[in-house]
């Protein structure tokens, strides 16, 4: 069987420059090629008429151009939105699958995309960790997710993605080179699809060395930290990575991020019944957040099959919220999206190994 040629879209932009210059071509040829791949979204070297025939033939002999595809989707309509929350199964060129979600809200439509196939952090409330870590995604595979979801949105609803969050499967800061390269592509104002970096967020479990590095880079993306508990032993019990990145060190890192970037941090706190919803938990969160330039995003838990956690009762979550507000913290409450379609990360990939229903019409 003939060996598949490497996918040229798997290169970061610096890697693409090195590949093209190694063929004796000037670096600007790589910039032209990159624009055709990620702005024009060409699928054949023959279409790239801005470069000469000899180079097109050379590239065709050593590289392929392959694109991810939408394999399936599930939708959940809400009364206050014309556009449903839609969860997609995205198939990569090697048949690896990840998840991406379109989330409508007032005045915005957010694409939640994956940065890894699986995850190595094994957060106990997350379905992705149950699938294990398989590989990092390339920057091209991340941009493909955005383009595919944007195409779906344009075709069915005549709208476009307004925000992007790297909050799907995987830990973005453990694949930082390709995540940042994808962000550079998605925010290139010379490309057909372009979004301000201020409309792009990276969500992390709190990988301190990479947070420190991100603070020193010129990118203007937003940072969200999955906190989920401000009590160290409790956080370790639901997020094993917290043992390596303890709360005092994390708080110091976030304060430095505030200072160097001038940007606030979002602390994401998912309420879990009888796990992190007590008055003591609220007090610990207030103490952790009080001196930081931050806002807190409280979210409901989407129940996951074969995982023990449960959503918090409404009355208890309201008391928790009131404790934070009374302490002067800025808090937003994110209502649960996609409960009926298993929108929590990792569930659709797990189910895809068995059977998926046809896309609703």
Swiss-Prot record:
GO biological process, one term: tRNA methylation
Radical SAM core domain: residues covered: 105-340
Cell compartments where the protein resides: Cytoplasm
InterPro entries in the record: Aldolase_TIM, Methyltransferase_A, RlmN_N, RNA_MTrfase_RlmN, rRNA_lsu_MTrfase_RlmN/Cfr, rSAM
Top-level EC class as recorded in UniProt: transferase
Binding-site residues for S-adenosyl-L-methionine, renumbered to this chain: 170-171, 203, 226-228, 302
Binding site for [4Fe-4S] cluster: 119, 123, 126
One cellular-component annotation, GO: cytoplasm
Additional information: Reaction proceeds by a ping-pong mechanism involving intermediate methylation of a conserved cysteine residue.
Protein's recorded name: Probable dual-specificity RNA methyltransferase RlmN
Organism: Chlorobium limicola (strain DSM 245 / NBRC 103803 / 6330)
């Amino acid at each position: 069987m003939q060996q598949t040629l490497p996918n040229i879209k798997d290169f970061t932009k610096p890697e693409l420059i090195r590949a093209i210059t190694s063929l004796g071509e000037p670096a600007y040829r790589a910039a032209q090629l990159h624009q055709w791949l990620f702005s024009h979204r060409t699928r054949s070297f023959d279409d790239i008429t801005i470069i000469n025939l000899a180079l097109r033939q050379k590239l065709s002999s050593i590289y392929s151009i392959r694109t991810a595809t939408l394999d399936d989707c599930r939708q959940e309509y809400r009364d206050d939105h014309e556009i449903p929350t839609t969860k997609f199964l995205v198939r990569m060129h090697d048949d690896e699958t990840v998840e991406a979600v379109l989330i409508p809200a007032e005045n915005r439509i957010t694409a939640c995309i994956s940065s890894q196939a699986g995850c190595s952090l094994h957060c106990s409330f997350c379905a992705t960790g149950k699938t294990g870590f398989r590989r990092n995604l390339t920057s091209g595979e991340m941009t493909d997710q955005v383009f595919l979801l944007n195409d779906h949105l344009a075709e069915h609803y005549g709208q476009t993605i307004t925000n992007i969050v790297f909050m799907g499967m995987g830990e973005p800061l453990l694949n930082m080179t390709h995540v940042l390269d994808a962000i550079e592509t998605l925010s290139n104002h010379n490309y057909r699809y372009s979004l301000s970096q201020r409309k792009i967020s990276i969500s992390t479990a709190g990988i301190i060395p990479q947070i420190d590095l991100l603070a020193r880079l010129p990118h203007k993306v937003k940072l969200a930290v999955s906190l989920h508990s401000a009590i160290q032993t409790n956080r370790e019990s639901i997020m094993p990575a917290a043992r390596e990145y303890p709360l005092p060190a994390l708080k110091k890192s976030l304060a430095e991020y505030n200072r160097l970037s001038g940007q606030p941090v979002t602390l994401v706190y998912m309420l879990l019944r009888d796990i992190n919803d007590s008055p003591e938990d609220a007090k610990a969160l207030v103490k952790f957040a009080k001196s930081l330039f931050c806002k807190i995003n409280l979210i409901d838990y989407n129940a996951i099959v074969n995982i023990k956690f449960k959503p918090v009762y409404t009355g208890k979550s309201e008391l928790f919220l009131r404790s934070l507000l009374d302490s002067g913290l800025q808090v937003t409450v994110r209502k649960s999206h996609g409960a009926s379609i298993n929108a929590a990360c990792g569930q659709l990939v797990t189910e895809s190994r068995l059977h998926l229903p046809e896309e609703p019409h």
